[in-house]
Regions:
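Conserved small/polar residues in nucleotide/adenosyl-binding loops
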Residues: 1-5, 154-157
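Accessory alpha-helical/coil subdomains and C-terminal extensions
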Residues: 4-125
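C-terminal non-catalytic interaction/assembly regions of soluble proteins
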Residues: 106-156
Length: 157
């Protein structure tokens, strides 16, 4: 697990606590553009009930069915979504923020699209949070440090 994964996982642990105390569904949007490894790794580590990644489009019905199952078992559902995730039927990732410095769409906001739909279709109060730039900071994990040391050692020899 790398810095981004552990920071995202810690944030999701806090979201789970909030969801549990209020019996809400929490949607956590993480960065990653068109690659879902941050969402996948942190979602698995945090015990998310639904993980939405760009590589695997899902329908709103599939998402809400999993949310409802978790809620029916007495859980406060946690949904982790990568910013580049597309719902089945969407042509491209959600973007309403213009273009970035490389003239690509600025991704983000899919969590705010999903949350009210989950709420509407399940009747479960749902909140969305974008983890954003907080994922970019933090101290390297032990794994990160060992990996960097090994890479340095191999490149030196």
């Amino acid at each position: 697990m790398c810095i981004r994964d552990s920071i995202a996982t810690e944030a999701m642990d806090r979201l789970r606590t909030t969801g549990d105390s209020h019996q809400r569904c929490m949607v956590a949007e993480v960065m990653g553009r068109h690659v879902g490894w941050i969402a996948l790794h942190s979602g698995i580590a945090a015990g998310a009930h639904v993980i939405c990644i760009p590589e695997v489009p899902m329908s709103l019905e599939e998402i809400t069915a999993q949310v409802q199952r978790a809620h029916d078992r007495g859980r406060a559902p946690l949904v982790v979504v990568s910013e580049g995730f597309t719902l089945k039927g969407m042509d491209e990732a959600y973007s309403d923020k213009g273009l970035d410095a490389f003239n690509r769409p600025r991704l983000g906001g899919i969590g705010e699209v999903l949350a009210p739909e989950i709420d509407r279709l399940t009747g479960i109060e749902t909140r969305s949070t974008v983890l954003g730039h907080i994922q970019r900071g933090g101290s390297p994990s032990a794994f990160d440090r060992v990996l960097a040391t090994r890479l340095g050692a191999v490149s030196y020899t």
